């Protein structure tokens, strides 16, 4: 705009001479022209020079004037400058446009990266919450999601580059604002158009150079570079420690005592009342450890601290205890106390650890193990060797590669510290030991400083002095962070004593220094053992794969698949049972039961009658006595409650068959599964029992009043009655032979003769035989009488007197058998519909519901563990899966460490 304005002004001034020299067509003399031109020259304007450059306004402007062109060497520089002014301005505009386009492209790229980063962060957090919810409800582990590697490389979404981009963007914005201010000042101060044009080009060139320089790291100062490197290192350390703790938790799930893979942890040891619990609680920021006058820490507490920036409310979770997320740390303290006090005082300590994981945004990623404190004297209710048990338990945990955190009280001589003596036995050089001196405010500052100087009992990581006394609960609310309160108290104490102002011991004072030291030492130890741990996991995995291939032929098995396979086998056997147990089998079952009932009625009401022999011989005689006997037998048979009797008989038979099928199935090794199956069968049978028995009773109700038998039924029943009597006769003869063989025929004859004499004698005979022998003789007499009656009745049934149905009173055996047939046939029809069909349909589905859909993961694991062979297979398979996952994670960490070292 400034150039256009200048050119327009220049054109107007070039037109002025011609209009001045020749207004309204008049012609001036040369003297007049020279006089007017000289006046214009004094004002700084040269009309002839302008005319010579741009030409006259009109072709006849100077036709009548004798003009003289003035030329000097000073006009050469101005001519060159004016000829280069337009190209320079165009180049400046092009450069400025290119710089503007580049800046807009960079802004679009950064905006796209931020959008991708935020979007993936939201998706990642949402999916993580979904995984936790599904895992807590169904115990199903959903897969993790991660951004593809190629997209990470494109977007540069790793931790270090993201931080570097944020710093560079801030520097770019700052310089852009400063450049804008400088350019605005220069445009306001410059009046000359030439200087304005040059200033625009210089500003555009400077903006191009500034954009190029901002993209590199050369614009950062040395302090900013160190700060950026330190922040990147801390982020990398935090990420590395968190991943290693995840690997440690994975390896802990293996539960194999023979595993040689161990990851470093910080083991806290010290004497009772040395302040171990206070130090741990100050690190965590909450009171959660058990406290008491007696020894309350009786089991190792494996404490895992997880830094979770998204966690607004800290919470804890116990491994192996289904308590969920616990946000009340007093409840955590109560649970820890109960778990520790579950160990009886007579036992002292138990090496079964308590695993607790705490998630919070203000805690570092650490793996700590709190052990029972060393004691000097045991109480009466404690074992005499309690001190030895505690020492052995501590030595088990303070072995390599664990880090030893030896807690000592400042008011106790270090020479008497049990923690330092124990650490010297396994770490003579003190390379893995960190000394923590508690109660620094109870000793003079000079003595405290002498301890921290690390001269008498040197340790590689030195001693860190803390106070860490728990502030009384009444002075702060439960929501306050204990770490901040302890740090404030420590800073107040150390700042009031000038002896602690020495810069050499400044990094060895306070709980914050201890936290930093623990983070650095744990990260260094884990990093140092990273390759060794990866090799150990790889070796363990190879051995596990070999054992799994040899023992189980690489056959993958899960609790769900095992139960499904077992159910398939059971259902196949059950289907075979349904084909073998139908109406005909139920009919035979009921018929057999009613036959026994008929035999009992005949034996009770006919065969014990003294007149049975005469009645059998005179079959044509009809006597009301015998008619009443038959009617009473029929009434008893029809009113016996056939519905319940038959239904109960069938349900018992089904239950027995189901029990036999279960014992022959893969569930025979699982008592709980057998109980599930039997309960399912009994529940269905119980639900159908009432309806079935009612239907059967209603259908046999007409037979309670009248029973009609046709000729075919009589004929069929006659043959069946003969068979029943023949079977009964065979049983009777078998019993006779058994008694004779047991006693002897000769002696039995003597006993029978003695019984006959005793029966006919008016006076009691001397006891020549034992009571048991006499009982055998009386049984033999009864069986002989029964044998004679059965033979007599069989002969009657075979005679012509029992040929027709009108002889039902003469041949009650045939008629009662016909009645039982009618009852059985009627009952079978409704039992088949109401009981068998429903049971065969519902039972397999009930098994699926109870054994597949209703069991939790814990119940499935408990169910599978009942089979020793299956338990060992699943444990080996779980170990292989955990090792594969751990190896995958640790290999990625190895690659990241190598890249970090190369950078």
From Swiss-Prot:
A Pfam family that the UniProt record links to this protein: Dynamin_M
Catalytic reaction(s) noted: GTP + H2O = GDP + phosphate + H(+)
Specify where the region named Paddle region lies, as residue ranges: 691-805
GO molecular function terms listed in the Swiss-Prot or TrEMBL record: GTP binding; GTPase activity; metal ion binding; microtubule binding
Which part of the chain is the Dynamin-type G domain? 260-531
Where in the sequence does UniProt note compositional bias of the Basic and acidic residues kind?
A: 167-188
A GO CC annotation given for this chain:
microtubule
Give TM segment ranges.
86-103, 198-214
Mind telling me which PROSITE patterns this protein's record contains? G_DYNAMIN_1, G_DYNAMIN_2, GED
Q: Where does GTP bind?
A: 273-278, 292, 439, 441, 468
The catalytic activity of this protein is classed by the Enzyme Commission as 3.6.5.5
Q: Which InterPro entries match?
A: Dynamin, Dynamin_GTPase, Dynamin_GTPase_CS, Dynamin_N, Dynamin_stalk, G_DYNAMIN_dom, GED_dom, LIS_MGM1
Q: Which SUPFAM superfamilies match?
A: P-loop containing nucleoside triphosphate hydrolases
Q: What does this protein do?
A: Dynamin-related GTPase that is essential for normal mitochondrial morphology by mediating fusion of the mitochondrial inner membranes and maintaining respiratory chain function. Exists in two forms: the transmembrane, long form (Dynamin-like GTPase msp1, long form; l-msp1), which is tethered to the inner mitochondrial membrane, and the short soluble form (Dynamin-like GTPase msp1, short form; s-msp1), which results from proteolytic cleavage and localizes in the intermembrane space. Both forms (l-msp1 and s-msp1) cooperate to catalyze the fusion of the mitochondrial inner membrane.
Give the record's subunit note. Answer: Homooligomer. Interacts with cdr1.
Q: State what protein this is by name.
A: Dynamin-like GTPase msp1, mitochondrial
Q: Report the source organism.
A: Schizosaccharomyces pombe (strain 972 / ATCC 24843)
Supply the gene name. Answer: msp1
């Amino acid at each position: 705009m400034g150039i256009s304005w200048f050119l327009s002004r220049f054109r107007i001034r070039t037109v002025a001479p011609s209009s001045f020299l020749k207004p309204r067509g008049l012609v001036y003399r040369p003297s007049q022209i020279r006089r007017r031109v000289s006046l214009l020259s004094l004002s700084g304007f040269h009309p002839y020079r302008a005319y010579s450059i741009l030409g006259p306004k009109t072709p006849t402007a100077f036709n009548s004037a004798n003009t003289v062109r003035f030329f000097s060497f000073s006009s050469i520089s101005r001519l060159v400058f004016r000829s280069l002014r337009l190209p320079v301005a165009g180049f400046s505009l092009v450069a400025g446009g290119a710089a503007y386009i580049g800046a807009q492209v960079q802004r679009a790229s950064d905006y796209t990266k931020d959008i991708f980063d935020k979007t993936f962060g939201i998706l990642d957090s949402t999916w993580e919450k979904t995984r936790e919810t599904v895992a807590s409800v169904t115990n199903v582990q959903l897969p993790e999601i991660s951004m593809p590697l190629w997209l990470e490389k494109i977007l540069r979404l790793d931790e270090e580059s993201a931080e570097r981009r944020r710093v560079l963007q801030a520097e770019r914005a700052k310089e852009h604002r400063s450049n804008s201010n400088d350019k605005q000042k220069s445009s306001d101060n410059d009046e000359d158009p030439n200087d304005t044009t040059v200033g625009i080009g210089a500003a555009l060139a400077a903006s191009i150079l500034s954009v190029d320089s901002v993209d590199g790291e050369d614009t950062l100062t040395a302090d900013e570079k160190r700060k950026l490197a330190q922040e990147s290192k801390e982020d990398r350390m935090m990420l590395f420690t968190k991943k290693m703790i995840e690997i440690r938790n994975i390896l802990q799930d293996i539960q194999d005592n023979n595993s040689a893979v161990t990851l470093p942890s910080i083991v806290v040891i010290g004497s009772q009342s040395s302040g171990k619990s206070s130090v741990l609680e100050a690190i965590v920021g909450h009171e959660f450890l058990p406290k008491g006058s007696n020894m309350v820490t009786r089991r190792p507490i494996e404490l895992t601290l997880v830094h979770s920036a998204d966690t607004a409310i800290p919470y804890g979770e116990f491994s192996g205890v289904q308590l969920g997320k616990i946000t009340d740390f007093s409840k955590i303290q109560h649970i820890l106390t109960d778990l520790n006090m579950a160990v009886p005082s007579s036992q002292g300590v138990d090496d079964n650890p308590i695993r607790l994981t705490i998630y919070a945004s203000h805690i570092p990623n650490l793996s700590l193990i709190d052990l029972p404190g060393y004691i000097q004297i045991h109480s009466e209710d404690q074992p005499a060797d309690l001190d030895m048990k505690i020492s052995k338990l501590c030595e088990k945990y303070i072995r390599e590669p664990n880090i030893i955190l030896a807690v000592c009280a400042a008011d106790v001589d270090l020479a008497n510290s049990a923690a330092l003596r124990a650490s010297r036995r396994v770490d003579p050089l003190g390379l893995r030991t960190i000394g923590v001196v508690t109660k620094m405010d109870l000793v003079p500052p000079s003595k405290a400083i002498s301890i921290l100087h690390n001269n008498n009992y040197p340790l590689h990581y030195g001693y860190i002095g803390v106070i860490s006394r728990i502030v009384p609960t009444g002075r702060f609310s439960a929501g306050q962070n204990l770490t901040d309160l302890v740090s404030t108290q420590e800073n107040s104490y150390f700042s009031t004593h000038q002896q602690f102002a020495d810069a050499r011991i400044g990094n060895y004072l306070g709980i914050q220094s201890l936290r930093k030291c623990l983070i650095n030492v744990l990260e260094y130890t884990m990093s140092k053992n990273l390759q060794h741990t990866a090799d150990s996991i790889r070796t363990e995995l190879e051995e596990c794969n070999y054992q799994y291939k040899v023992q189980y032929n690489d056959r993958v098995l899960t609790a769900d698949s095992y139960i499904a396979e077992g159910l398939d086998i059971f259902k196949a056997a059950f289907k075979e049972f349904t084909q073998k147990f139908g109406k005909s089998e139920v009919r035979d079952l009921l018929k057999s039961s009613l036959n026994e009932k008929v035999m009992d009625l005949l034996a009770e009401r006919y065969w014990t009658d003294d007149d049975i022999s005469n009645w059998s011989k005179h079959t044509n005689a009809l006597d009301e006595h015998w008619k009443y006997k038959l009617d009473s037998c029929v009434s008893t048979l029809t009113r016996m409650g056939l519905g319940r009797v038959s239904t109960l008989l069938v349900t018992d038979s089904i239950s027995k068959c189901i029990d036999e099928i279960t014992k022959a199935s893969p569930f025979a090794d699982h008592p709980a599964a057998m109980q599930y199956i039997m309960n399912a069968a009994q529940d269905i049978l119980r639900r159908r029992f009432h309806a079935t028995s009612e239907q059967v009773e209603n259908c046999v109700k007409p037979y309670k009043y009248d029973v009609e038998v046709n000729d075919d039924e009589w004929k069929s029943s006659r043959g069946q009655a003969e068979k029943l009597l023949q079977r009964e006769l065979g049983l009777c003869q078998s019993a006779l032979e058994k008694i004779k063989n047991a006693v002897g025929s000769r002696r039995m004859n003597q006993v029978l003769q003695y019984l006959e004499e005793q029966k006919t004698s008016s006076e009691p005979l001397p006891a020549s035989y034992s009571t048991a022998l006499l009982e055998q003789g009386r049984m033999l007499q009864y069986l002989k009488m029964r044998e004679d009656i059965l033979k007599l009745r069989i002969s009657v049934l075979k005679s012509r007197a029992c040929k027709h149905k009108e002889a039902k009173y003469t041949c009650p055996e045939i008629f009662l058998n016909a009645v039982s047939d009618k009852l059985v046939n009627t009952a079978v029809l409704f039992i088949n519909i109401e009981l068998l069909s429903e049971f065969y349909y519902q039972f397999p589905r009930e098994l699926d519901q109870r054994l597949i859909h209703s069991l939790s993961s814990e119940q499935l694991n408990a169910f599978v563990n009942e089979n020793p062979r299956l338990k060992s297979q699943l444990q080996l398979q779980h170990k292989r899966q955990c090792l594969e996952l751990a190896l995958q994670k640790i290999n990625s960490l190895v690659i990241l460490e190598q890249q970090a070292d190369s950078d």
